[in-house]
């Protein structure tokens, strides 16, 4: 529960996992478990295999005023069996409200939300 009540702001996060040496879970510009009452704002996040990933038990989190772009699998890369997809924001198994507002999302895929009981993304 180390990130509860945290603020992550004004960072420039880029070029995470571009060599594709790690193709499974846990790879992202910002990756948090149990993001309870966390604020992620005014970050510039680009050229990662995934931008922001809030996993398991996110509630009361807010993602605001961020610029995300080019968060895609690098050109020519081979997708690994069981590897994760790429997008700017991924909310997985959230337990409460998550507010996503006033962001600029410019990657090929901007948002994946898999927190409902049916496990269907938006």
Segments and roles (model prediction):
Residues 6, 33, 37-38, 60-61, ...:
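Solenoid scaffold repeats with emphasis on beta-solenoid/beta-helix
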Residues 120-122:
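N-terminal low-complexity segments that are often proline-rich with Ser/Thr-Pro
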Residues 30:
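Extended ligand-binding clefts on enzyme/binding-domain cores
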């Amino acid at each position: 529960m180390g990130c509860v009540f945290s603020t992550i702001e004004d960072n420039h996060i880029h070029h995470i996992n571009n060599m594709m040496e790690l193709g499974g879970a846990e790879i992202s510009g910002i990756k948090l478990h149990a993001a309870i009452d966390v604020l992620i704002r005014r970050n510039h996040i680009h050229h990662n295999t995934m931008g922001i990933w809030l996993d398991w038990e996110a509630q009361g989190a807010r993602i605001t005023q961020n610029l995300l772009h080019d968060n895609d699998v690098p050109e020519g890369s081979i997708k690994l069996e069981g590897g994760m997809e790429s997008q700017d924001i991924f909310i997985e198994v959230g337990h409460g409200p998550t507010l996503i507002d006033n962001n600029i999302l410019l990657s090929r895929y901007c948002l994946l939300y898999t927190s409902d009981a049916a496990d269907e993304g938006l």
